[in-house]
Amino acid sequence: MKHLTTMSELSTEEIKDLLQTAQELKSGKTDNQLTGKFAANLFFEPSTRTRFSFEVAEKKLGMNVLNLDGTSTSVQKGETLYDTIRTLESIGVDVCVIRHSEDEYYEELVSQVNIPILNAGDGCGQHPTQSLLDLMTIYEEFNTFKGLTVSIHGDIKHSRVARSNAEVLTRLGARVLFSGPSEWQDEENTFGTYVSMDEAVESSDVVMLLRIQNERHQSAVSQEGYLNKYGLTVERAERMKRHAIIMHPAPVNRGVEIDDSLVESEKSRIFKQMKNGVFIRMAVIQRALQTNVKRGEAAYVISH
């Protein structure tokens, strides 16, 4: 049984194994070792990509899937998250995927339950499977992380994606740049350097946009003029390196953090990220339940 709650708990070797397993699954290799097992997806925050991606991953592995949202569980009646997970464990659930608005909701939970917990996003904290699918997408493009410059733009302070990605990319040998409004800078995230949007775009191999996390701000945030000040405009995109790519964890607010015409442009890998998410989550579930597809020769060589 292996939980996955943060990227920092994964060694470089484990990351390599997950990426390689995901790539093999993407090529069609699977042995359905998990057929008949039960997965519960428990989401206390709205989700489209992560929720359905996990469900597709589970079904591709032959699992039975239980989907629950926070409003339909007894948590609404005062039940603790611990008791909810213990209930699922007692009725035969084998793995639980959780998205929660509370940072580090899993901190005590993982030592108290007997089924693996997979973190599908905790507040402003971490989003490990998003980070892994981003790594897979970047590696497919460049066959390395070492020496790359990856810039992350926008609401850094409230972004669990920025937090997960900055740490692991730095560990794998990439240089991380941040840009965005000064009030949204994250002083606790020391894995990147803040520069102007223009400087970051021109020097990056990967330009990663973030949406404004409106649900985590205490007051409404004006979107007027945001694109020209802090977003990826057509004019800025024209100054990107020839080989550089555009990424976004989605949901995308077209015309806010990225010009509408760039979302599905030649440089964009946004929908490829979503596709890769299914295979990464299949690999993560296999790891959680300690099963793996049979590997051939090592395909991923990660320098650090």
UniProtKB/Swiss-Prot annotation:
Catalytic reactions on record: carbamoyl phosphate + L-aspartate = N-carbamoyl-L-aspartate + phosphate + H(+)
Signal peptide: none
Alphabetical UniProt keywords: Phosphoprotein, Pyrimidine biosynthesis, Transferase
Associated pathway: Pyrimidine metabolism; UMP biosynthesis via de novo pathway; (S)-dihydroorotate from bicarbonate: step 2/3
One example GO MF annotation: amino acid binding
EC number: 2.1.3.2
List of residues that carry Phosphoserine: S303
UniProt cross-references to SUPFAM superfamilies, sorted A to Z: Aspartate/ornithine carbamoyltransferase (SSF53671)
Top-level EC class: transferase
Protein's GO biological process: 'de novo' pyrimidine nucleobase biosynthetic process; 'de novo' UMP biosynthetic process; amino acid metabolic process
Domain of life: Bacteria
Amino-acid positions noted as binding carbamoyl phosphate in the UniProt annotation, renumbered to this chain: R49, T50, R99, H127, Q130, A250, P251
Matches recorded under InterPro entries: Asp/Orn_carbamoyltranf_P-bd, Asp/Orn_carbamoylTrfase, Asp/Orn_carbamoylTrfase_sf, Asp_carbamoyltransf, Asp_carbamoyltransf_Asp/Orn-bd
Pfam families membership: OTCace (PF00185), OTCace_N (PF02729)
Amino-acid positions noted as binding L-aspartate in the UniProt annotation, renumbered to this chain: K77, R160, R211
Assembly information from the UniProt record: Heterododecamer (2C3:3R2) of six catalytic PyrB chains organized as two trimers (C3), and six regulatory PyrI chains organized as three dimers (R2).
UniProt record similarity statement: Belongs to the aspartate/ornithine carbamoyltransferase superfamily. ATCase family.
Role this protein plays: Catalyzes the condensation of carbamoyl phosphate and aspartate to form carbamoyl aspartate and inorganic phosphate, the committed step in the de novo pyrimidine nucleotide biosynthesis pathway.
Name of the protein in question: Aspartate carbamoyltransferase catalytic subunit
Naturally occurring in which organism (per UniProt): Bacillus subtilis (strain 168)
Gene giving rise to this polypeptide: pyrB
